[in-house]
Amino acid sequence: MAIKNILALVVLLSVVGVSVAIPQLLDLDYYRSKCPKAEEIVRGVTVQYVSRQKTLAAKLLRMHFHDCFVRGCDGSVLLKSAKNDAERDAVPNLTLKGYEVVDAAKTALERKCPNLISCADVLALVARDAVAVIGGPWWPVPLGRRDGRISKLNDALLNLPSPFADIKTLKKNFANKGLNAKDLVVLSGGHTIGISSCALVNSRLYNFTGKGDSDPSMNPSYVRELKRKCPPTDFRTSLNMDPGSALTFDTHYFKVVAQKKGLFTSDSTLLDDIETKNYVQTQAILPPVFSSFNKDFSDSMVKLGFVQILTGKNGEIRKRCAFPN
């Protein structure tokens, strides 16, 4: 890596508050000499898909997050298994969507620059570009990740944060990945474009403590609204995680959480910690022009993209994202 690029990356990481032991692991210009149009190719494919189906932005962002939280940002969430025991087969990942976008971007790259760009990098770029397509923030994606060869269902179950988790558990989950409480609340803000289903909220509505009760931390009016949408036996109906602003990347999610209308326990529990609560309440009342959320989200996404990465001779560059070479 050229000295100027190392310095540029160090400056970038200093600006966004990221601490990385060896800054030259990744490079903003990693593919510039061998495949200068790599990012342009990925962006073109992503725009093509997301402009037709805006809900893909949330799905691709979620996929990148789930990839990074299990064995690091190594594309292991993309791997298939003949025995259905890969990460994508774990219950939390059964609802992941958008694989076709990653595959299309990888195929386009293989035509232009074969055996060069990792699926892990493709997924990181696709997630960034998908959010940008719907008007969300754009963030720099240092490149040079390598693809993992291992993908285990149990790893996903052990590492992915649960929508039923309390704040203490979530902070521990994030700390294990080198992410702090601010990253937790900021990345939770990605739920501003999130979509879920009655299946993940049913217990909060009808059997929170095993006695047929509702979660007392929820706004009673929101409980009534959700019960109308989700009868006790309905596990399929889709729910917007940010009602009224579901396809807009903005701070409305924090207003919802501040009103005790967070869909998941993991949303509501952000009010149970001083630091995360202060962030929620601040973003909830600030006019968008004064909000730091877009920058904060960009900073935390850069940090997320460095979690347990494979570089150098570790891992491989997959030819097809669903299968190891």
UniProtKB/Swiss-Prot annotation:
It catalyses: 2 a phenolic donor + H2O2 = 2 a phenolic radical donor + 2 H2O. Slightly expressed in roots. The record marks R62 as: Transition state stabilizer. GO terms for cellular component: extracellular region; plant-type cell wall; plasmodesma. It comes from the Eukaryota. PROSITE patterns: PEROXIDASE_1 (PS00435), PEROXIDASE_2 (PS00436), PEROXIDASE_4 (PS50873). One of its GO terms (molecular function) is heme binding. Heme b binds at H191. Removal of H(2)O(2), oxidation of toxic reductants, biosynthesis and degradation of lignin, suberization, auxin catabolism, response to environmental stresses such as wounding, pathogen attack and oxidative stress. These functions might be dependent on each isozyme/isoform in each plant tissue. This is Peroxidase 1. It comes from Arabidopsis thaliana.
